[in-house]
Amino acid sequence: MTELVIHLAPHDAFHFLKENPQAVLIDVRSEMEFLFVGHPKEALSIPWRDEPDWEISPEFLARARRATSLNRPVVLICRSGHRSSEAGLFLQANGFSAVYNVTHGFEGDLNDQHCRSSLNGWRFDGLPWEQC
């Protein structure tokens, strides 16, 4: 299968969302990450994998379909861009036609001290976010 998910840097994803108000931003991290680490403003929480087993959520596809339509652009974000890329391929395989992934995710890559949010990512780039 050819990877068709379009990868956008955080700033590019933010501008894409502003220029395409019909697009939906879905945060695929766990509910706890979404609530306690923070999330992009206006993101919907639809976990791809969640506690306690970190298995693919059997409700993911149905929840994504309820949140948007197959033809609307969907922008996915996770912690570092890996889970969202995987979820994007799954959505495409299930009929979604315009799927985008935020590279580096919300928290970004690990630095030399194994800390996130210090090299790249949505939060590092100073894009709008909130914490519950």
Outline where the language-model segments fall.
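Conserved G/P- and acidic residue-centered "switch" motifs that form tight phosphate/ATP-binding loops
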Residues: 27, 81
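Short, surface-exposed ligand- or partner-binding patches at beta-edge/loop junctions that are enriched
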Residues: 76-77
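Rhodanese-like catalytic fold shared by cysteine-dependent sulfurtransferases
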Residues: 1-23, 31-73, 84-132
